[in-house]
Amino acid sequence: RVCYAIPLPICY
């Protein structure tokens, strides 16, 4: 599981 917060918070 990978989560990013740029530009919006999204988790794959």
From Swiss-Prot:
> What GO terms fall under cellular component here?
extracellular region
Where does the entry say this protein is expressed, by tissue? Expressed by the skin glands.
Q: Superkingdom, according to UniProt?
A: Eukaryota
Sites where Tyrosine amide occurs are at Y12
Tell me a GO biological process for this protein.
defense response to fungus
Q: Does the keyword Disulfide bond apply?
A: yes
Q: Which UniProt keywords apply?
A: Amidation, Amphibian defense peptide, Antibiotic, Antimicrobial, Disulfide bond, Fungicide, Secreted
Decide whether keyword Transcription regulation is in the record: no
Q: What intrachain disulfides are recorded? A: C3-C11
Cellular localisation: Secreted
Q: What does this protein do?
A: Antibacterial activity against B.subtilis, E.coli, S.aureus, M.luteus and P.putida. Antifungal activity against S.cerevisiae.
Q: What is this protein called?
A: Tigerinin-3
Q: Which organism is the protein's source? A: Hoplobatrachus tigerinus
